[in-house]
């Protein structure tokens, strides 16, 4: 299980991505950041809103305890995601790459089960528009 201050935590039971508060991160590379911003601009009309806090570990824990509904980012390091992704899964989240495959630092999506597939499809579609 996952705990916060000795209390069991669970991710939100959200099932509608139009109500999802989604968190992401942006690259330090200006070119990559431009592509990421274009992706987010394509997604913003289909979700409630976007947030950025700047630390994958915190973002993942915020999804785990229900402060956020989803988190996605790319080009992370294993140490950026290892603990937070485990906590999120223990809190009931699903995790994978943007297409729903296995977790990998190159692409990470974490969300409650009810929005994982629709959010994965949205991220994939918004990303393919950049190619």
Task: Specify the residue positions occupied by each region the protein language model found.
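Short secondary-structure boundary segments
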Residues: 26, 74-76, 98-100
